[in-house]
């Protein structure tokens, strides 16, 4: 197996730090995982970057959805057929967010209906098919769940594959990997 690149190692360390920081802020964390994308032909690297910036900026003012968020890790990717998409991990105060599947649906619908004005798609990973990835409520003292979250989810989000390049060839930087600021 190929050794992870320094970039992947750095990203993984940052992602794990966000998880650790969130668990220090609240003894129970609601872990939400979404894949965000576009309908065929509706997305580009630049649009994805712009829409993701809107999502992050709007999160500050959209308290009905993001009020109890304490962290996030986001990876932008380009898949087959120029399919631009995002893998996102959102961390919320678990004592406030009781229904993680519903919270994932709220964020997904917000992406689809408001941010992308109907052009967006989302996949709610907080379903039974992803149970092994420790999504949903995680207790601070549950080391097995925390380690599985770091290995399976943060590890997946931090991978090097499917790198994004600007669609118009500009030098404008598109940040492929984004994390919340570690709160102390």
Residues of each region from the PLM?
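Amphipathic, alpha-helical segments enriched in basic
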Residues: 9, 63-67, 86
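Short catalytic/ligand-binding loop motif for oxyanion handling, primarily in non-cytosolic enzymes
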Residues: 42-43, 82-84, 97-99
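Histidine-centered divalent-metal-coordination microenvironment in nucleic-acid enzymes
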Residues: 72-94
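Catalytic "initiation/cleavage/transfer" segments centered on a nucleophilic residue
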Residues: 1-26, 94, 98-184
């Amino acid at each position: 197996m190929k050794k992870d690149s320094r970039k992947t190692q750095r990203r993984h360390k940052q992602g794990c730090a966000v998880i650790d920081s969130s668990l220090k802020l609240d003894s129970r964390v609601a872990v939400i995982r979404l894949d965000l994308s576009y309908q065929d032909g509706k997305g580009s690297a630049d649009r994805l970057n712009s829409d993701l910036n809107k999502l992050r900026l709007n999160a500050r003012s959209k308290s009905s959805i993001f009020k109890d968020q304490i962290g996030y890790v986001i990876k932008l990717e380009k898949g087959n057929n120029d399919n631009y998409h995002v893998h996102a991990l959102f961390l919320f105060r678990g004592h406030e967010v009781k229904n993680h599947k519903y919270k994932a649906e709220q964020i997904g619908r917000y992406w689809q209906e408001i941010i992308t004005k109907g052009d967006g798609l989302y996949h709610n990973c907080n379903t039974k098919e992803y149970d092994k990835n420790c999504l949903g409520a995680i207790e601070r003292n549950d080391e097995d769940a925390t380690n599985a979250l770091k290995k399976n989810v943060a590890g997946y989000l931090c991978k090097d594959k499917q790198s994004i390049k600007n669609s118009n060839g500009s030098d404008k930087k598109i940040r492929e990997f984004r994390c919340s600021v570690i709160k102390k």
